[in-house]
Amino acid sequence: MKILVTGAKGFVGKNLCAQLNNIKEGKCVIPGLTGNLEAVYEYDIDSTVEDLDRYCSDCDFVFNLAGVNRPQTPEEFMQGNFGFASLLLDTLKKHGNTCPVMISSSIQATLAGRFGNSEYGRSKKAGEELMFEYGKETGAKVLVYRFPNLFGKWCRPNYNSAVATFCHNIANDLPIQVNDRSVEMELLYIDDLVDEMIAALQGNEHRCAYDGIDVVPVIAGSTSSVIAGSTGDLTGRYCYCPVTHKITLGEIVDLIYSFAEQPKTLMIPEIPENSFAKKLYSTYLSYLPKEKVSFPLKMNVDARGSFTELVHTLNCGQVSINISKPGITKGQHWHNTKWEFFIVVSGHGLIQQRRVGSDEILNFEVSGDKIEAVHMLPGYTHNIINLSDTENLVTVMYCNEIFNPQKPDTYFEPVE
């Protein structure tokens, strides 16, 4: 299978081509695609008409992501969006190539509500109709996607994405402007978009109709029941990405500022799987300047070694790193409710525990050569001893709560 991607150097194009090449090279295994993807043709503004002609002659699927969204004049919208689509389809027809063609449109093409006078929307709508006519004329499968606002890594800031601009500016300590924090946006994450493109490539696209600007999912075989009561085009001829997030500008900005504070607070925010916060955090990190990629941690150093907090969480405690010099014993205390994991990752040591009020000592010999986690039990006084005369003992320590100096829950008592 040979894939043509137009607009390959744009935001969506770069991400899609990267994943397609991962599949082609076997770095990402997609059943049915891995091993069958022969070439990814990347076409962009610096490519030639001859390149397009060659690619259209033997491609098996087209992702048309080329377009104009920031022209010098309104007329360039139609030239860049409708004009190139015409050239692409004419070139495919020249070679008798009726492979499936996907085109990226925009929610503005609905020309509904606030988009009623959008020149960009009109040009995208014209491109859509051209694509539908092409499908009728040639029998080729066409997939028209109306994308909402997009975000993710590699998106150009200060151009066409508020999220990209917010992430870039906050990461670089630059001011941002939010005129109305209550404005709600519908956002599509780039990885979710790419996942849908891969699904479309396999014939598993999600179909929909539109009721104004609202997506109406269409289920194969039950179209009438799904879209009953809607207005407008109800044929399900459009495609859509099923995973989007609706969130206000104020919420977006607050999240990004909380991410920016993480090196100071060590606090990892709540980032559930597939949540908007998880996707936004990854996006924010992609805009960090070099000088912020690494940051210092506060090392509490004394003659015995050091103790450094690494990560705090809102509800799941903290992770720290402890270094003990040769022959040193640390700990000799117990907790009522607090509990810990000690995980030696380098060196050779002994962990001892004794239940308060008992004489029995539990001994655990630990080593970086055989990494294991040892519970520090509530109500048991415990210590950790570096058995080496020459090497430091390095221990990762997880505690179920963040240290609170007002309520340390720590009581000195030697194990022996």
Q: What positions do the PLM features span?
A:
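N-terminal Rossmann NAD(P)H-binding glycine-rich loop of SDR-like oxidoreductase domains
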Residues: 3-22
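Mid/C-terminal beta-alpha module of Rossmann-like enzyme folds, strongest
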Residues: 199-298
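A conserved pocket-lining segment of Rossmann-fold NAD(P)-dependent short-chain dehydrogenase/reductase
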Residues: 148, 165-188, 200, 208, ...
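Substrate-positioning beta->alpha
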Residues: 157-165, 182-202, 250, 254
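Conserved beta-loop-beta element that borders a ligand/cofactor-binding pocket
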Residues: 129-154, 174-183, 233
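Flexible, glycine-rich beta-alpha linker
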Residues: 110-111, 118-119, 145-164, 174
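NAD(P)H-binding glycine-rich loop region in Rossmannoid oxidoreductase-like domains
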Residues: 47-84, 91-93, 108-115
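Conserved Rossmann-fold NAD(P)-dependent oxidoreductase catalytic core, especially the SDR/UDP-sugar
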Residues: 86-128, 135-138, 143
